[in-house]
Amino acid sequence: MIRQHVVRGGTAPVALGLLLLLGCSGKSDIIPMNLVPKGGKEVAGSVQTVKPMPGPRVAVIPFEDARADRARVGSRTSMWGGETDFNVSSGSAGEETAQAFVDYLKRKGWQAQYSKVAPAAENGPDIVLSGKILELAVDAKRGFLLTDIEARTKLVIQAKNREDESSIVRTDAHSGNHDNVFWFDPQDGEGILSEVLEKNFERFVMNTRFEDRSIRFR
């Protein structure tokens, strides 16, 4: 579980504070949210791939979204009651989660590729990764000048081996928060949601190992 505390910015004029408080979004507003943050030097460096290591070929297919509201991934609320929904920018949390998983695996040296559908067994990948989204949300609560951000994820990840048709399944849940953010930007929400989402991927990788062309639990 991630627990972070950050303070951004400094003292601001009272007039600016009043503008921030009065500029509350209405309940009908929607902000698009990327599960893999776009832009920024820090983000660009984090998605750098490494040379693939020898091992099985892995395909990641879109996750099943088991949430009641599949478009929504949280909200921003103000101290005056205004609310803005965060929606998945592409419209599919399952696809973006799978693509984020592929990015993570490539950074770890896996021979991983995203596939829109499950590949055919013949001449296909050695391992197919899929999953289910049980929880995926980031909520930003604005107080007087400062905003607290909390992200929560719960994923089921399944790996199916082509060689013997065996499979393994793991479920993980993680949360994290950034408190007292002075000037909230949607990228702040994207960043922490991405961090928490990757904790699920990290746990899966840490608790599995390759055995020839298959994947097993450690």
Residue ranges and their predicted role:
Residues 1-7:
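N-terminal secretory signal peptides that target proteins for export/translocation
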Residues 80-92, 160-214:
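Short secondary-structure boundary motifs at beta->alpha junctions and helix caps
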Residues 12-21:
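Bacterial N-terminal signal peptides
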Residues 25-39, 108, 115-167:
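Surface-exposed short loop/turn segments
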Residues 96-109:
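Amphipathic alpha-helical segments
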Residues 24-98, 206-218:
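A structural "domain/chain start" motif
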Residues 62-67, 132-138, 175:
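Generic short beta-strand segments
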Residues 72-74, 140-144, 181-186:
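Short acidic, glycine/proline-rich loop/turn micro-motifs
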